[in-house]
Amino acid sequence: MPHRKKKPFIEKKKAVSFHLVHRSQRDPLAADESAPQRVLLPTQKIDNEERRAEQRKYGVFFDDDYDYLQHLKEPSGPSELIPSSTFSAHNRREEKEETLVIPSTGIKLPSSVFASEFEEDVGLLNKAAPVSGPRLDFDPDIVAALDDDFDFDDPDNLLEDDFILQANKATGEEEGMDIQKSENEDDSEWEDVDDEKGDSNDDYDSAGLLSDEDCMSVPGKTHRAIADHLFWSEETKSRFTEYSMTSSVMRRNEQLTLHDERFEKFYEQYDDDEIGALDNAELEGSIQVDSNRLQEVLNDYYKEKAENCVKLNTLEPLEDQDLPMNELDESEEEEMITVVLEEAKEKWDCESICSTYSNLYNHPQLIKYQPKPKQIRISSKTGIPLNVLPKKGLTAKQTERIQMINGSDLPKVSTQPRSKNESKEDKRARKQAIKEERKERRVEKKANKLAFKLEKRRQEKELLNLKKNVEGLKL
């Protein structure tokens, strides 16, 4: 029977791959316990060359496998409103679960294994995260009430029943300010200083500043004079920020006001008026000639001058009065004394001395220079490291054998003395015997070299195998 090709269970060309990812925090089903928290995300098969060509259109020239186009967003075009179906989480027990059909393969999967089509603008984690810092979009009164700084017992903080009508009415201060603005606009650019002084003198009486009741009761006083007296046009600024505290975002409660006052007192010390001496041009005023204060100042001046004066019986050269009287005499009596400073000796305590008597903590040792280890060379013929294995000498049996060879196999013909009456035939025979002996000696020498070489190689291999076996048996 012909062998049939088995059909694969999954066709890679038509297959659809998914990534198992966590459900988005903006997904409405993220808070549903019955819905799975992990969903399937279809993978998009994009050719690398096509993706890189698309990236080059937008100026991305990185040659790697990362998809930089996922960070780009298409510009929003004209938008239109379309009716959307309301999303509702289905109960598995009551209603059947919806199925999603993948058009490329025709696979039907439940919709719960995929992410929701509609997502919220803010995720669950951002909704639960607390907001830190001042909230400028909140009413300061609401912030003060949340911080327990709002005084509910204060009658000024209570609203009347007709607070809307009262808020729409113009108060007396606003009317006064309107009158003041109109008068300021009518004023000319140049003013007479004498007239201002005359007007300002009318605003004060012998008792001091005018109170609010006095201002209201005094007839003929203009709104401008009252405003100048009450400093309506002046705004107190902070020395620290150069801004008025009314422009602050936070409502100033009692503790913050106390904190601001302390800062103001602290920065008053660094005002220009408090630094250095005042100029003489700014000092004004007068004092009587026979006043006690002037007499005390003169007495202090004469007393200080008398202390610095020294009466001399005879005329002497003027010396520096700031120096002490006996300073010159003491300088003459000074002598140079040489002091020898001895080097402080090292003092040993009992514990240090006892430690030198034993080798428990005292380990005297000579520091030696360790030479660099030699490089290991490997034989090209045997593959065994050279000069690593120990060299063995000849055994007693091998030495005895060599001695026997040396005693018995010595060349006899070459050592025999030549006769003086030797004939030509004897000489020719003797030379031929020497040649034969030398030839045999060369053959024997070559055989011995080969035998020793093979024996050396065999012994090196045995030692190497023995060393490997011993290392393998270590525990």
UniProtKB/Swiss-Prot annotation:
Outcome of substituting residue 168 to S: In IPHAK; uncertain significance; due to a nucleotide substitution that creates a novel donor splice site resulting in aberrant splicing; small amounts of canonically spliced transcripts with the missense variant are also produced; decreased protein abundance in patient cells
Post-translational modification Phosphoserine, affected residues: 17, 24, 248, 331, 408
Keyword Cytoplasm attributed: yes
Biased composition (Acidic residues): 184-213
Compartments where located: Cytoplasm
Coiled coil regions in record: 418-475
Keywords: Coiled coil, Cytoplasm, Disease variant, Phosphoprotein, Ribosome biogenesis
Region (Disordered): 23-54, 74-99, 169-213, 405-447
Composition skew (Basic and acidic residues), residue ranges: 419-447
Listed GO CC annotations: cytosol; nucleoplasm; nucleus; preribosome, small subunit precursor
GO biological process: ribosomal small subunit biogenesis; ribosomal small subunit export from nucleus; ribosome biogenesis
Entry-linked InterPro entries: Ltv1 (IPR007307)
Tissue: Expressed in the epidermis.
Function: Essential for ribosome biogenesis.
Similarity remark: Belongs to the LTV1 family.
Disease: Inflammatory poikiloderma with hair abnormalities and acral keratoses: An autosomal recessive disorder characterized by mottled hyper- and hypopigmentation of the skin, sparse scalp hair and eyelashes, sparse or absent eyebrows, and palmoplantar keratoses.
Protein name: Protein LTV1 homolog
Lineage: Eukaryota, Metazoa, Chordata, Craniata, Vertebrata
